[in-house]
From Swiss-Prot:
Coiled-coil segments on the chain, per record: 53-294, 323-391, 450-561, 597-630, 660-707, 765-792, 979-1143, 1217-1241
Keyword Transferase among UniProt keywords: no
Keywords: Coiled coil
Record-given protein name: Coiled-coil domain-containing protein 171
Signal peptide: none
Region (Disordered): 1306-1326
């Protein structure tokens, strides 16, 4: 018993020690595993972060490059627009010059036509005269024949001897009649030919003009063709831009293909990950980490998809911008067509097209601004994405902190589990049965276990697996619930983002509306300022008008007073004259013989004229007052309308502001409700998360039970993890080394294909050049080449031998490659055809010859042994040991860690490559090609030297099959030079033909001159017939001359027929050109229709501008009305001044008449016997009359007093007029200053309104105005008024000088001068 107890106690002690050792080992292993997992996760997170940053930087670089491209395109478009504007200006200048030249040519053609018409009329008159002369000659000839016949009948008996002579004369007569008839027929023919010749000459001139016009049209067509070439260049540039855009789209497609490839890789990795999860279901930490990585990859893929969508949106925007650019180009084409039609239209259409161009430029600038705004919005989106990335990084860091906390909690749970295990061991120690059982187990470790123990272990493991499966199912359910909650959260976040986007859109709309309000407020403020200025000016002008009205009233009062005084004076004068109170002594004066009736009549006439002038002045004053009242009423009405419009605008703005405030409040309420709903949902999700946390706590409790069983599996896992880590590191390094090589091989293959295509095109080009050279070569050269080919046929045998040698070399190389090949398979991508990778096995092959089925079996065995070789695994693990140590010891925060890791990776990769080179000895690294090319006496170099020799010999003997390109190009150049020389010769022939045509024209002119000479000869013949002295010789000479003329005319007709044929050919060409021009006109008509539609749209746009401009036009009309009022006031003042001058002249005339009466009385007193005393009022002198007034009676004194009072009144009036004139000059200076201010204001407004065309002003409604006098015609120009001359003094001076000689001439002329002077004021008053 003692022995048993001692043995039991020893066993228990040993068990405790072993359990403690096992616990320490487990702790160390768990800590190492945790650190390894954390390092792996950190490594992966850093890798993902680096990948994200690289992608982000690449996207930023691509966007910046796209923005730079767009800017360059915009700059190119602006440069093109400027060049097009310059071309348009040049074309317009050329069109103007062409028009002027065409107009001048048309004027010259009209002048020539008029000259030809005059010549035609002259020729017709000449023909009529010749016909009349011919008829008269015929009549005379008939009369003479009758006379001859009558004489012959009477004297038949007397002239029997002369019968023969008579017969001869009759025969001659018949001949002459025949010749005359023939001459008449020839004359008619010549007449017809002359008319036809005149018509043909006119037609030729018109055709020449038409040829000139055709030349001008050709020049215009050449200009149009140049413009078409410019448009084609534009098209080419657009196509280049489209190709660039296609390249960008290809790059994007490649990026999408790479993304698809990355997604495929991710799917493969996911599959591998699922396989590992199926193998290792018990590792929950790894499962959670993998799920987190899976979710992160999903999130990254979603981000990538969003970026792809954004890129697609940017592509659509670029496409839209390109479509807009194409539309702009089409609009520019239409404008070019308009320019072509503008060559035939007037200047008005040209101005309209210029206005359209300006509008299109504005639209182009607005579109550029829109594009810049879109680019800024894209930049904002990129900034938002970067912010989201930062937020995701923050969330990743928070998740890492939560993982650290969870691991700490797991360590705490492990400690609690160990404590529980200790407690269980103590409990087992307390129980003897459990201790015996455990001791029996430990004792019998070396022995094979019993069947019952195995069954118990199986039962326990099965129960444990059942519990684990239940826990795993519960965990899966919890994970599914978490996924659903996450999906809901994502949906809620998306809804929140959408609401935020809507908020941003609404804020943008609000900002846009605020900007519009600010613009309108600025417009209202400017309009208010302008109104204030206008009102201020109006008030000033109103005050000036009031002052002028007050001055007019004062003047009218003064005028009324003067008129009343004059009326009283005239009334008293009339009463005195009627009463006959003038008492003058007979020896001193002639008043006793003065007729009172004549004096009364003169005074009555003067008084009537003055009254009429006064009535007219009153009527004018009333008319002016009426006009002023109407204008003041209109100004008040305008003020009221302006105030009403401003009040309406203010009310509308207030209503809009109230609507905006209401909308803002509604939006705030809506978004507050939405935020409350989001908060409620967040609370719900927090409750769900708390429930999930409780479930997780329950799972952790179950996890504590599973930790005990994990200790057995961790030993196995440590080995597998080490192997996996080493394999993963080796695979990563090999993948990093393989993929760049594969990408380089892909790039080299694409370059090879491209170069092969270029070589093929170059060879085709060479063949085409050679075929052209052979086709264009002369027959002699071909014969020489055939002879040379016959001589040199033996050279083809050398080439055949060379081909056989090269085929043998290629077969030997293929044989060596097939023997040394240890390939397993070749991999080809699905979307990249023609690019593959060779996968080889590393085991050495036996070089024995086997049959085919044995070779296939051996290949399968070699592949199996290579894929499951332990040597390769050992080599990889041994080479990656150093790297695994560095990864295990690496700290993520230290800088030295990166350098150590890179150095370890280099060393491990070098070791791995060395060991793989030892394993894969069968595959030769260096090919035999380099050796063969390096050797000097190799077969390849020998063949190259032989080929060079054969080619040189072929060149020497000039074989056709191997003609170099230089010779073919030289032959082509020679042939092209020959063609150019032929063209030059053809042009010389054409010019010689033109010279021949000019010579033909000269010959035609000479024929015209000869025809004129023939007409002169005909006239001479007629005169010769009239003279009756026609001899036979002269008649024959005339006939010969006529025959020569006929021959010349026939030659001329032949030439004319040839010219007519040429003209018919030219007419046919003209008809062809006219048909082409008709087609062009149809196209132009279609373009005009499209332009009319564009004009309608532009008119619709212009209507809005016109509505805005109407207010300004109304203000301008008000200003013009005020100016008209001012000018009317000025005219009224002028009329008043003229009336005053007329009254003053009239009063002076009265004074002059009185002076004349006094002089006549003093001079004609001695000649009282004469009864020729008449009233001579216009000749009076105040000083002499005053000197003789003392000698008379009281009536003379009364007259003197009356005249003195009249002169005093006149002096007072003259002084008052001078003062008024001074005031008028002051008023005029003030008005001139106001006009200058108005002129400057109008110039500013006109400068602001110069962008609007003249048609806008012509369509404006101008109210009807009263007809102005001739002095107010220059109001529209706002010219400063000129200072009026003081014509009162000069007029009085002239009248005084003119009246003196009339008094000296005779006394009988006094009544006439009196009546003339009496009528003069009335004319001036009118």
């Amino acid at each position: 018993m003692n022995l048993n107890t001692s043995s039991n106690t020893g066993d228990t002690q040993r068990l405790k020690i072993a359990s403690l050792d096992v616990k320490q080992i487990l702790k160390n292993e768990t800590e190492l595993d945790i650190t390894d997992n954390l390092r792996k996760k950190l490594h992966w997170a850093k890798k993902e972060k680096l990948e994200i940053t690289t992608k982000h930087n690449a996207e930023l670089a691509s966007y910046e490059s796209q923005i730079a491209k767009l800017r360059s395109e915009v700059e190119k478009g602006e440069a093109l627009r400027q060049s097009l504007e310059y071309d348009l200006a040049v074309a317009r200048k050329e069109a103007g010059l062409g028009r002027r030249a065409a107009e001048e040519r048309l004027a010259e053609a009209h002048r020539i036509q008029e000259k030809l018409c005059a010549q035609n009329s002259e020729l017709q008159a000449k023909t009529n005269e010749t016909e009349k002369a011919f008829q008269t000659s015929q009549q005379k000839w008939k009369e003479e024949c009758r006379r001859f016949e009558h004489d012959l009948e009477e004297r038949d008996n007397m002239i029997q001897n002369c019968n023969r002579e008579y017969d001869l004369l009759m025969k001659e007569k018949s001949r002459l009649e025949k010749t005359l008839q023939e001459a008449l027929e020839k004359h008619q023919r010549e007449k017809n030919e002359m008319e036809s010749h005149i018509r043909e000459t006119a037609l030729e001139e018109f055709r020449l003009q038409e040829e000139q016009w055709e030349a001008e049209r050709r020049e215009l067509q050449f200009i149009v063709q140049e413009q078409d070439t410019a448009v084609q260049n534009m098209h080419k540039k657009v196509e280049k831009l489209e190709t660039e855009h296609m390249d960008c789209s290809d790059l994007l497609r490649r990026q999408t293909s790479e993304l698809e490839f990355s997604t495929q890789r991710e799917e493969r990795l996911r599959k591998e990950f699922e396989a590992t999860t199926l193998r290792v279901r018990k590792l929950e930490e790894n499962i959670e980490a993998e799920r987190a990585a899976h979710l992160e990859s999903k999130f990254n893929s979603e981000i990538i998809q969003l970026r792809i969508r954004d890129l697609e949106g940017a592509l659509q925007v670029e496409k839209a911008s390109q479509a807009e650019a194409v539309a702009d180009l089409e609009i520019i084409k239409n404008e070019f067509k308009e320019v072509e039609s503008a060559y035939e239209r007037e200047k008005h259409n040209a101005q309209e097209s210029f206005a359209k161009l300006n509008l299109l430029e504005k639209e182009y600038f607005s579109k550029n601004k829109k594009l810049n705004e879109d680019i800024e919005e894209q930049k904002k989106v990129i900034i938002d994405l970067s912010k989201r990335l930062q937020y995701n990084e923050k969330s990743c860091s928070e998740l890492q902190e939560e993982l650290v906390m969870a691991k700490k909690h797991q360590a705490f749970l492990v400690e609690t589990c160990e404590n529980n295990v200790k407690e269980l061991e103590s409990i087992l120690d307390s129980f003897t049965v459990s201790g015996q059982w455990t001791s029996g187990i430990h004792k019998d470790k070396d022995k094979p276990p019993s069947f019952s123990v195995v069954l118990e272990r199986l039962r326990r493991t099965l129960t444990d697996y059942q519990n684990k499966l239940e826990d795993a199912s519960n965990e899966e359910k919890a994970c599914n619930e978490l996924d659903s909650t996450k999906q809901k959260i994502d949906s809620h976040t998306k809804n929140i983002k959408e609401l935020q986007d809507k908020l941003a859109d609404v804020n943008k709309e609000l900002s846009h509306l605020h900007t519009k309000c600010a613009d309108r407020e600025a417009l209202i403020s400017t309009l208010k300022v302008e109104l204030q200025n206008v009102l201020h000016c109006w008030e000033k002008e109103k005050a000036q008008a009031a002052q002028s009205e007050s001055e007019l009233q004062k003047l009218s009062q003064a005028f009324h007073k003067d008129a009343e005084e004059k009326l009283t004076f005239l009334h008293t004068l009339y009463q005195h004259l009627v009463a006959g109170c003038v008492l003058i002594k007979q020896p001193e004066g002639m008043l006793d013989k003065f007729s009172w009736s004549e004096l009364c009549a003169v005074l009555q006439e003067n008084v009537d004229a003055l009254i009429a002038d006064l009535n007219r002045a009153n009527e004018k004053i009333r008319h002016l007052e009426y006009i002023c009242k109407n204008k003041s009423d209109t100004m008040r009405e305008l003020q009221q309308t302006q105030e009403d419009t401003f009040t309406k605008v203010a009310e509308q703005i207030k209503a809009q502001e109230s609507c905006w405030h209401r909308q803002k409040k509604e939006l705030e309420l809506q978004y507050s409700e939405l935020f409350l709903e989001v908060q409620k949902r967040a609370q719900k999700f927090q409750e769900i998360a708390e429930k999930n946390m409780e479930k997780l706590n329950h799972i952790e409790k179950s996890h504590e039970q599973l930790v005990l069983e994990n200790s057995h599996f961790k030993k196995l896992l440590s080995q597998t993890q080490r192997e996996q880590m080493s394999l993963l590191a080796a695979c990563a390094l090999m993948a990093g080394a393989l993929y760049p090589l594969y990408s380089r091989s892909c790039a080299l293959s694409t370059q090879r294909d491209f170069l092969q295509e270029q070589v093929n095109t170059f060879e085709l080009f060479k063949l085409e050049i050679r075929t052209l050279a052979q086709a264009l070569s002369t027959v002699e050269e071909k014969k020489q080449e055939e002879a040379k080919m016959k001589k040199k046929t033996f050279k083809g045998l050398i080439r055949i031998f060379r081909k056989g040698v090269i085929a043998v070399l290629a077969a030997n190389r293929l044989k060596i490659l097939g023997q040394s090949c240890a390939s397993l398979f070749t991999w080809m991508e699905s979307f990249k055809e023609g690019i593959g990778m060779l996968v080889c096995t590393g085991e050495p092959q036996d070089k024995h010859k086997f049959p085919k089925h044995q070779k296939e079996q051996l290949r399968c065995l070699q592949a199996l042994s290579w894929l499951t070789s332990s040597d390769l695994l050992a080599a990889i693990i041994s080479s990656m040991a150093e790297l695994q140590d560095v990864i295990g010891k690496a700290d993520p925060n230290s800088r030295i860690c990166g350098h150590l890791l890179i150095g370890a990776a280099k060393n491990s990769f070098a070791k791995l490559m060395d060991k793989i080179s030892l394993v894969m000895e069968c595959i030769p690294l260096h090919s035999s090609r380099s050796i063969t090319y390096v050797e000097k006496d190799s077969l390849v170099q020998r063949l190259a030297h032989g080929l060079h020799k054969v080619n040189t010999l072929a060149l020497k003997y000039g074989l056709r099959g191997h003609v170099p390109i230089t010779k073919s190009t030289a032959s082509l150049q020679k042939q092209i030079l020959g063609f150019t020389q032929r063209l030059h010769a053809a042009e010389v022939e054409r010019r010689s033909l033109r010279l021949e045509v000019t010579e033909f024209k000269r010959s035609v002119n000479e024929m015209k001159k000869e025809l004129d000479k023939a007409q002169g000869l005909q006239m001479q013949l007629n005169e010769f017939k009239q003279s009756k002295l026609i001899t036979h010789e002269k008649f024959e000479s005339a006939c010969e001359e006529l025959n020569n003329a006929l021959l010349r005319e026939e030659q001329a007709q032949m030439l004319l027929n040839e010219q007519a044929q040429q003209l018919q050919e030219l007419n046919y060409k003209l008809e062809l050109h006219s048909s082409e021009e008709a087609d062009k006109n149809q196209t132009l008509g279609e373009a005009v229709k499209s332009l009319s539609e564009a004009k309608m749209e532009l008119r619709r746009k212009d209507q809005s501008l016109r509505q805005l401009n109407r207010h300004l036009t109304q203000l301008e009309q008000d200003k013009r009305r005020l100016e008209e009022n001012i000018h009317d006031a000025e005219s009224a003042l002028r009329m008043a001044a003229k009336d005053k001058e007329c009254v003053a002249n009239h009063m002076r005339a009265v004074e002059n008449t009185l002076h004349k009466v006094r002089d006549q009385i003093s001079l004609s007193w001695s000649a009282a016997s004469r009864n020729d005393f008449t009233l001579q009022l216009p000749k009076l002198h105040l000083e002499t009359f005053a000197m003789e007034g003392l000698k008379g009676g009281p009536e003379v004194v009364a007259c003197q007093a009356m005249i003195k009072s009249f002169m005093d009144v006149y002096q007072l009036a003259s002084t008052r007029i001078m003062t008024l004139e001074k005031e008028m000059t002051s008023h005029r200076s003030h008005i001139a200053a106001l006009k200058s201010e108005l002129h400057t204001a109008c110039l500013r407004e006109n400068a602001s309104l110069q962008s609007i065309g003249s048609r806008d002003h012509s369509n404006l409604s101008i109210p009807s105005r009263a007809p102005l006098p001739a002095d107010t015609t220059g109001i529209g120009d706002f010219l400063p008024l000129k200072a009026e001359l003081d014509t009162t003094y000069t007029f009085l001076k002239e009248t005084f000088i003119n009246t003196v000689p009339h008094a000296l001439t005779s006394s009988h002329s006094s009544p006439v001068t009196m009546s003339a002077n009496a009528n003069r004021p009335t004319q001036i008053g009118l």
